[in-house]
Amino acid sequence: GLLTEAGRMFWRDAGIVLEEQSGAVGMLTSKGAEELYGIGERMGRRFSRIFKGDRFRKTVKCVSSTSPRCLISMTKFTDGLKDQIKGLEYCYITGADHYAYLAYHPEPEEGLIVSGDKEMAFRRTESLPELLFAHFFTETDWIKDFVGGDIYWFERRLYQFACVGQLTDYGKCLLEYFPEEPLVKNWEARNARFYVAYANSKELPHYATQVATPLLKKIIGRIDFALQDDSDVAADLCFGHDVTLMPLISHIGIRGMYERLSFEEVNGRWDSAEFIGMGSNIQFVFYRNNKGDILVKILYNEKETDIPALKTFQGPYYRWEDLRNYLVQSIS
């Protein structure tokens, strides 16, 4: 046959993944739903004193993109929170107006165009499709005709599909079938592309700010409302997309995202798996000290972080007044 032993094993597991995910492109898997439940559960457990500390603040506002995966994420996250904190009242909202800032796409989508061109240029000079094909196929002469001549496109599609396996209920990481060198080159191509498409790249110096601004304005306004003395808001939650979250954290300049890098500088200095994996989230957690100051700390993917450009007030905490001024000035 045309398949080597590695090719047969890859094809076997790929078939299971394809059958499981038939008709579900872009949807949340059961594994993803479980992870969102866990994030909500951990938030409730970690900040139980905050949720229980004010008997008048009982409303949890939940806003989601209209995307089905975001709606299910919202449901599962709040299920986890409910199991930890009793007595809260949940308000669920979605709609086109909310999608507009939770998944903002400027036209033309310059980030996708520029990053895609950079990725394919890298692949044509650095990637090793022949090694990958020889690993999976006993004969490779037919591949160029089969894919219309673009072997780099075919290699990219194989890699992208292999990345999906570990996200499914089957849970098999198909990348383990890749030889080391082609695996590394494929990761480098995609990793640098993510940065150029959505972060503080030198190629697109204003893109992150352009995408993040509508969402950041909403965040500031909703925090201001929640912090009013007569507010009943215990938490205000948004469920959106990585294509907006990554520009947001880049524009804000949290640790690990504030550098401005070119496509060629990204690998070795930044890892997409650390900053924009499935279920990525940013949390602003508010406190009031004995002097009445409103303090806030930032968590990214449930770990405390900071903004190197803005000095904290004490430990991981900012005065909200200072952080608010910084954020407002960044979009003014």
List where the protein language model places each region.
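Signature for phosphate-centric chemistry
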Residues: 1-61, 65-236, 240-332
